[in-house]
Curated annotation (Swiss-Prot):
Keywords: Coiled coil, Nucleus, Ribosome biogenesis, rRNA processing
Domain of life: Eukaryota
Organism: Debaryomyces hansenii (strain ATCC 36239 / CBS 767 / BCRC 21394 / JCM 1990 / NBRC 0083 / IGC 2968)
This protein's name: Pescadillo homolog
UniProt biased composition (Acidic residues): 478-509
Length: 600
């Protein structure tokens, strides 16, 4: 039997360190990181680090050897090497002062594409849709960032364009399902091709960019994510029979911007627009052909006409024979009644897609237009902005006078009072739109009137801890809490004496006990309550004993797992109890304030 050489099998063969991988690929560390991000290769943790590192215990990063071998055949790797030589040549030309050569080199800069990597990592379109959450979050983050020395203006504009194209598609197809306005930003959830997609849009506030963030890694992710979103948007727009990329109204983009500046046209409309131009071009070609045609003699024309007649007669005879021979099949309908025919589902079958279709909203200038515009358009509603009307009044006063604002049904305001109200309009706060969208129904407007205290804006995805804020507080729980407070005030000595008493006492002993308690100044009703609590405590102690016995029978691994599980359960229950106590206190204060207001 041959002796195996150390470090040639097992973990030492399956894993490779980062320094070894960089040497093998012959690239810089920055290019290696970019390549790993593009290909989706991440560090691995071997079971035995010492064996994987061939006896060394130094802290290192490991990768699978197969992954690094897979990177050797990547075309982008060759482009990285070409760029390295290009940078050397450019630096040499600039150092010599050869500006024309430097310009030629700049024109021939090596470029790479990520299309083949997208196809490798996402073989089907649904795979890309399932992984679209992180790209959307990253792109919306960069779209709201200001341009700095590390992040150029071109990158932020490209991210903004892609995100607006995504929002325009979701609003056009009415795919939005849930909205939640939080401290971090606005969470949206849409159902795209049967896949639930959730993303976060930050608020458009001035942001302080931290200095400890490595923007090189973030920009690498952004490059990959933008390519992926281009693929997804192209497929979604084509499936919806829309032109991609959508046309942009430059006048609106200079003014308000947002979704209103993106004009989504179907491909049929684009073809109709091109048809008149095509007809004109065809007519001009025919005219030129007529001019170029030579005049034929009368004999040639008569021969051609006779030949055409004979061909037409033969063709008609053949067609009549074929038609006589063919017998058409008759398909009788199996449906006895005409009412049994099923109606096809409409495009906007979900309740949220047509929730606000009958309303026209007038949005005040103090309300964030981008959030409400997206939500209202996704629910089928129409929107008129006060800011857009102000711009129209300044730039085109004649068209502004022709506008008819009598069709407006709702006005969204975010002010405590409205100075002058228009008859026929319903005045609501912005939260009404979000809550209606989350509940998939129109809620009463009275709670959302200007100046009213709004109901709590709850997350539509619920609480992971199990706390339900909509659930009513049971009166029994309140009674138990009051009993606990009373018992805390009373003396501990009497409690201990009562808990030690047994339930199966004789009547004489019970009477003697009541006399002793009355002498101590405790009422008989309170003593009965304490007896009940003592019985509950005994039941709990019996359950605890059973649990302890079960723990003894567990193995060491099972016991540790049970402790971890119990710790998590206790933590959730403690959080739930704290939240219910806070809610009870709030309800008490509200009730007291209501009583004071009634008295006044």
């Amino acid at each position: 039997m041959r002796i195996k050489k150390k470090g040639t099998s097992g973990n030492a063969k399956n894993f490779i360190t980062r320094t070894q991988a960089v040497k093998k690929l012959q690239v810089s560390l920055a290019d290696f990181r970019r390549l790993c991000i593009f290909k989706g290769i991440y560090p691995r943790e071997p079971r035995n680090k010492k064996k994987a590192n061939k006896g060394s215990t130094a802290p290192v990063t490991f990768y699978y050897t197969k992954d690094i071998q897979y990177l050797l055949h990547e075309p982008v790797l060759g482009k990285f090497r070409e760029h390295k030589t290009f940078a050397k040549k450019l630096q040499r030309a600039l150092g010599r002062g050869e500006v024309s050569d430097a310009q030629k080199l700049e024109g021939n800069r090596p470029k790479y594409t990520l299309e083949h990597i997208i196809k490798e990592r996402y073989p089907t379109f649904l795979d890309a849709l399932r992984d679209i959450d992180d790209p959307l979050n990253m792109l919306f983050l960069f779209a709201n960032m200001p341009a700095t020395d590390k992040v150029s203006h071109r990158i932020t504009k490209e991210a903004e364009k892609l995100t607006n194209q995504w929002l325009a598609y979701v609003a056009k197809e009415r795919l939005i399902k849930k909205v939640f306005v939080s401290i971090k930003g606005v969470y949206y959830q849409a159902n795209v091709k049967g896949q639930e997609v959730r993303w976060l849009v930050p608020f458009k506030f001035p942001t302080n960019i931290p200095t400890d963030v490595d923007f090189r890694i973030m920009l690498t992710f952004l490059e990959f994510y933008s390519t992926l979103l281009h693929f997804v948007l192209f497929r979604l727009y084509n499936d919806a029979n829309l032109i991609y990329p959508p046309t942009i109204d430059t006048e609106k983009l200079k003014g308000i911007g947002g979704l209103s500046s993106y004009v989504l046209q179907s491909k049929d409309q684009g073809v109709k627009a091109l048809l008149p131009n095509a007809k004109k071009a065809a007519d001009s070609k025919d005219e030129s052909k007529k001019v170029k045609e030579t005049k034929l003699s009368k004999e040639e024309i008569s021969k051609a006409v006779a030949a055409d007649k004979s061909l037409n007669e033969n063709a008609e005879d053949n067609v009549s024979e074929n038609v006589e021979d063919v017998e058409l099949d008759e398909f009788s309908s199996t449906n006895k009644t005409a009412g049994d025919l099923l109606s096809q589902p409409s495009k906007f079958a979900s309740p949220t897609s047509t929730l606000l279709s009958k309303f026209i909203f007038y949005v005040g200038r103090e309300v964030p237009l981008d959030i409400l515009e997206f939500c209202i358009l996704s629910c089928g509603g129409s929107i008129i902005s006060e800011i857009a009307l102000d711009e129209l009044q300044l730039n085109q006063p004649e068209e502004y006078k022709k506008l008819d604002l009598s069709n407006i049904t709702h006005q969204i305001v975010d002010r405590p009072t409205v100075a002058s109200k228009v008859a026929g309009r319903t005045y609501v706060q912005p939260q009404w739109v979000f809550d209606c969208l989350n509940k998939s129904e129109l809620l009463p407007v009275s709670q959302y009137a200007p100046g009213e205290t709004l109901p709590p804006h709850l997350s539509p995805w619920g609480d992971a801890g199990g706390y339900n804020p909509d659930a009513e507080v049971k009166p029994t729980e309140q009674g138990e809490e009051e009993e606990e407070e009373e018992e805390e005030i009373e003396g501990d000595e009497i409690e201990e004496d009562v808990e030690e008493e047994d339930e199966e006492e004789d009547e004489d002993l019970q009477a003697q006990k009541e006399l002793e308690l009355e002498a101590a100044g405790v009422k008989s009703a309170d003593a009965q309550k304490k007896d009940k609590k003592s019985s509950k405590g005994k039941k709990r102690s019996a359950e605890d004993e059973e649990k302890d016995l079960k723990k003894i029978m567990m193995s060491n691994k099972q016991r540790k797992l049970y402790k971890k599980m119990q710790y998590g359960i206790d933590k959730k229950e403690a959080r739930q109890d704290d939240l219910t106590k806070k809610r009870r206190k709030l309800e008490k204060t509200k009730a007291e304030l209501g009583k004071l207001n009634k008295k006044n």
